[in-house]
Amino acid sequence: MTVRIAINGFGRIGRNVVRALYESGRRAEITVVAINELADAAGMAHLLKYDTSHGRFAWEVRHEREQLFVGDDVIRILHERTLADLPWRELGVDVVLDCTGVYGNREHGEAHIAAGAKKVLFSHPGSNDLDATVVFGVNQNQLRAEHRIVSNASCTTNCIIPVIKLLDDAYGIESGTVTTIHSAMNDQQVIDAYHSDLRRTRAASQSIIPVDTKLAAGITRIFPQFNDRFEAIAVRVPTINVTAIDLSVTVKKPVKASEVNQLLQKAAQGAFHGIVDYTESPLVSIDFNHDPHSAIVDGTQTRVSGAHLIKTLVWCDNEWGFANRMLDTTLAMAAVGFRLDASASTKL
């Protein structure tokens, strides 16, 4: 069965989802039937074809009136401001990928479903009242047909959760801290300008800028046993893509750095193949641009102090890796089937 998807919001993640769909060879499994975006069709086509981070798109892209052509495929372009006006029923949409970054609670999900979509996948953590939050590679097997409104978590949650799981399963995590070293984003300023967050009033290209993060809450949403046992901070740095995460955990069992690396490398080659990668090459952030993994462990940076404090450095392409996981989760949602009885919904 080919899953019919619509994309709401054609920004960084929305465009990368389309690119990843075609570049990963999953076009036979997923068809994009519509994209809803307030920008004009010319701008949408141009930014799909030319991307500063990811280069030129290999497929031919053009637009004609309110249609976007990718190769031989035709995608309908919409410019609806109100979710209730979206023609998902008319278009036979199975799953809406809401990549706006604006919508993310149950009411928004229900609006997509009322418009005719069978399921909704948000491209950010969303509210706690959604049916499920999925970190693909860790908990997607818990999805059920009645899970209609789902979050794909965040790029950083997808990056760090597999590593936390591996370390916890092997050594038993007692507590941890996370520092996200994240590339600049479009909620920052090119030059100094007003913002509700005074740190984000400053030019993104000229400073390392501390920002708020809900990553600790994202960790405990997937692993409730770590409630009040993880803390996180985040800084934005003057690069446009790729993120590094510094993870420090205190564990119950004594361990050596070489054993930690052996564990993570084995997982990358086995159970977490395609989700986690491992390297000991002397790489820098640009080398992970366009990497489809959720997490790439840098084995050269693993440290252990006092046999119980583990520090690791984990990289991710916060756009490309996450876009690929959006596609993985979409297929997982479709694979469990579509149950249209809203009263049957159970929370994951």
UniProtKB/Swiss-Prot annotation:
Keywords: Cytoplasm, NAD, Oxidoreductase, Pyridoxine biosynthesis. Pfam families: Gp_dh_C (PF02800), Gp_dh_N (PF00044). It is an enzyme of class 1 (oxidoreductase). It is found in: Cytoplasm. NAD(+) binds at residues 12-13, 81, 318. Its EC number is 1.2.1.72. It catalyses: D-erythrose 4-phosphate + NAD(+) + H2O = 4-phospho-D-erythronate + NADH + 2 H(+). GO terms for cellular component: cytosol. InterPro entries: E4P_DH_bac, GlycerAld/Erythrose_P_DH, GlycerAld_3-P_DH_AS, GlycerAld_3-P_DH_cat, GlycerAld_3-P_DH_NAD(P)-bd, Glyceraldehyde-3-P_DH_1, NAD(P)-bd_dom_sf. GO terms for molecular function: erythrose-4-phosphate dehydrogenase activity; glyceraldehyde-3-phosphate dehydrogenase (NAD+) (phosphorylating) activity; NAD binding; NADP binding. Pathway: Cofactor biosynthesis; pyridoxine 5'-phosphate biosynthesis; pyridoxine 5'-phosphate from D-erythrose 4-phosphate: step 1/5. It comes from the Bacteria. Substrate binds at residues 154-156, 200, 213-214, 236. Gene3D superfamilies: Dihydrodipicolinate Reductase, domain 2, NAD(P)-binding Rossmann-like Domain. The record marks 182 as: Activates thiol group during catalysis. Its main location: cytoplasm. GO terms for biological process: glucose metabolic process; pyridoxal phosphate biosynthetic process; pyridoxine biosynthetic process. The active site is at residue 155. HAMAP family: E4P_dehydrog. Homotetramer. Belongs to the glyceraldehyde-3-phosphate dehydrogenase family. Epd subfamily. Catalyzes the NAD-dependent conversion of D-erythrose 4-phosphate to 4-phosphoerythronate. This is D-erythrose-4-phosphate dehydrogenase. It comes from Salmonella typhimurium (strain LT2 / SGSC1412 / ATCC 700720).
